[in-house]
Amino acid sequence: MPGPLEEKSKKFAVRIVRLFQHLADEKKEHVLSRQILRSGTSIGANISEARGAQSQSDFISKFSIAYKEAFETDYWIDLLEETGYIQAKLGKSLKADLNELISILTTSLKTSKANRQTTSRL
């Protein structure tokens, strides 16, 4: 059963897909919109994939990828906003959701790495 982080990341991915569809419908930017589609949906995909991790290292790896994809997505949001392809209000809203995901991922990664250290000492 998906947890709260998976649900939040899926809702964020849906927002990104809708943004991509809007940009495509408006015949606006294509390269940047594909980049944000890829990185923005990859966050949730890696979080979901971590649920089936075969080891703690595998789990940490998937969450680390999701974390990096979140920062890449942040970059694309900035670029789309600064080039006028999306309004500042939308950019701010997307970033608020993204920052929440980053915060949860940061905490989860710190905890998982600390647990791995503790386990390896036993």
What are these regions (language model features)?
Residues 1-49, 53-122:
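Short, C-terminally biased terminal segments at protein or domain edges
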